[in-house]
UniProtKB/Swiss-Prot annotation:
Biased composition (Low complexity): 36-45, 53-64, 134-144
Biased composition (Basic and acidic residues): 17-31, 65-80, 103-113, 122-133
Family membership noted in the UniProt record: To kiwi fruit protein PKIWI501.
Organism in which the protein naturally occurs: Hevea brasiliensis
Keyword Zinc: no
The keyword Acetylation appears for this protein: yes
Post-translational modification, as annotated: The N-terminus is blocked.
UniProt-recorded name of the protein: Major latex allergen Hev b 5
Keywords: Acetylation, Allergen
Length: 151
């Protein structure tokens, strides 16, 4: 019966004026239409839009359902950031020290390997042949004479 009276009052007012009763109608029509499962979905999709429309209308009627929606939103908000923060923190901490620890010994072993064979052992060739490939290629190209043929 109340909805019938509200509708007649809304139609009696000019179009420029919008009474608070119509806002209450909007919230009342949305609340029964949305079951608890859909309330969570709508809260996830648009949490900001539901709160402002429900709060200024009538705090007495929609209070229990808005409180439930707010509780659901609070629970969802507290659950979502916590796992994300926990997942990123452990991944970052162990990920950074492991590669650094692996790389440092590799460089040390390479340096010791290059330093150790620098001194020729018995029966080995001199260290000149142990030059890097780039140096050997440069010396080979510079030492080879270029033959020009005159015709």
């Amino acid at each position: 019966m109340a909805s019938v009276e509200v509708e007649s009052a809304a139609t009696a007012l000019p179009k420029n004026e919008t009474p608070e009763v119509t806002k209450a109608e909007e919230t009342k029509t949305e609340e029964p239409a949305a079951p608890p499962a859909s309330e969570q979905e709508t809260a996830d999709a648009t949490p900001e839009k539901e709160e402002p429309t429900a709060a200024p209308a009538e705090p007495e009627a929609p209070a229990p359902e808005t409180e439930k929606a707010e509780e659901v939103e609070k629970i969802e908000k507290t659950e979502e950031p916590a796992p994300e923060a926990d997942q990123t923190t452990p991944e970052e901490k162990p990920a950074e020290p492991e590669p650094v620890a692996e790389e440092e010994p590799k460089h040390e072993t390479k340096e010791t390997e290059t330093e150790a064979p620098a001194a020729p052992a018995e029966g080995e060739k001199p260290a000149e042949e142990e030059k890097p490939i780039t140096e050997a290629a440069e010396t080979a190209t510079t030492e080879v004479p270029v033959e020009k043929t005159e015709e």
